[in-house]
C-alpha cells in the first residue's frame, strides 16, 4: 500500500508555523538584537569624534608674551605629572583663554563644561535619558497573535565620562559656581583613577580613567557673587594657580589681536582702562578694553565724547542704578582728562 500522506493537500490556513518560518522569525529577532548592539558599539567608537566637535567653544586669537608664558609653563609642568590645575582670578583676566590654549596644545581631544548653580552630577557623568524597544510577534496559531515588547533604558554619557574614556583634556569653566555636592564625583577620578557613575546599573558603573586624561578648572575669586567654596577634600587634590591682570604690554597685545582696525589707539584705551581699574570699585578686566576698542572701530571720527560714551557703555552693566551710571561717567571723564588720551 502506497503512503500518500505527504502528498495530501490541506485546505485553509496552516495551524502551525513551519520550521523554516520559525527559523526566519528567530533570525529576524537576532538581527534586530545585533543591530541594537552594533549601534551601541558604534556610539562608543564615535565618542572620540563627538568630543572634538560638540563640547568646546571656537578658538580665538591667543597672544603669548613673557607674562603669559610664565602661566602656561607652570600649567604644563603640573599637567605633565597628572595633577589637575585650578586657575583662580578676577573676571576678565584671561583664565578661560589660557586654559583653552593649553588644552588645545596637548594634542588630545578637549571637552568643555561650564559650571553653574544648577549643574548636577548627572550633567557631568550621564544618566538614563533614552529608551530602546524590541518587539517580537509570534503567530504560532493562525488566529492567535503573541506579542512581546522589551523596553530597555539606555545610558547617555555626558562630558566628564566622555573625557575620562577618551583621554581628553577636561576644561571645567566656572568650576566654583557649581554646588560642591555635584563635584564629589571628581574625588575618585583624581585620587583612585576611577569614575563612578551614580545611578548606572551593572558592572559598567565604574569607568577606568584613561592615562592621558587631564583637567583644567577655572574659578573667579571667592569675593564674587555666586561663587561656592569647593570642599577641602577636593581642593587638596588640585594645584592652584592664582592669576591677576597682565601687564600693560601684554594687555595691549591681547587687545590688538582682537581688533582689526589699525587706526584704533589700542595702547591709549588699555592705559585708560588700567587707570579706571584703580579708580573704580567694579572689576575692569582685559575684556572691557577689548570691547571698548571694538566700539571705537564702529564710530565715525571718534572724539573725546565718543570715548566716554563707549567706556560708559562697556562698564555700565556692572552697576545697578542710573545714579551709579552717572557717577561712573564722571569718573571716566575725569580719567580721560587726566591722561590726555588722544585718538590719533
UniProtKB/Swiss-Prot annotation:
Stated EC number for the protein is 3.6.4.-
**Broad class of the protein's primary localization:** other
Going by the UniProt record, its keywords in alphabetical order are:
ATP-binding, Cytoplasm, Gas vesicle, Hydrolase, Nucleotide-binding, Plasmid
Q: Per its record, what triggers expression of this gene product?
A: In PHH4 (a deletion of the p-vac locus) not transcribed in exponential phase, highly transcribed from stationary to mid-stationary phase. Small amounts of longer transcripts that probably include gvpC-gvpN-gvpO and further downstream are also seen. Gas vesicles appear earlier when grown in static culture, possibly due to O(2)-limitation.
- Record-listed ATP binding positions: 89-96
Q: Which GO terms describe its biological process?
A: gas vesicle organization
Q: Where is the composition biased (Basic residues)?
A: 7-17
Q: Where is the composition biased (Basic and acidic residues)?
A: 18-52
Q: Could you tell me the superkingdom of the organism this chain comes from? A: Archaea
What is the protein's quaternary organization? Forms homodimers, a GvpN-GvpO heterodimer, interacts with GvpC and GvpL, might interact with GvpA.
What biological function has been recorded for the protein in this entry? An ATPase that functions in gas vesicle formation. A minor component of the gas vesicle, also found in soluble extracts. Gas vesicles are hollow, gas filled proteinaceous nanostructures found in several microbial planktonic microorganisms. They allow positioning of halobacteria at the optimal depth for growth in the poorly aerated, shallow brine pools of their habitat.
General remark: Encoded in a 14-gene locus called c-vac which produces cylindrical gas vesicles only in the stationary growth phase.
The name on file for this protein is: Gas vesicle ATPase GvpN2
Source organism of this protein record: Halobacterium salinarum (strain ATCC 700922 / JCM 11081 / NRC-1) (Halobacterium halobium)
Q: Taxonomic lineage of this organism?
A: Archaea, Methanobacteriati, Methanobacteriota, Stenosarchaea group, Halobacteria
> Gene name?
gvpN2
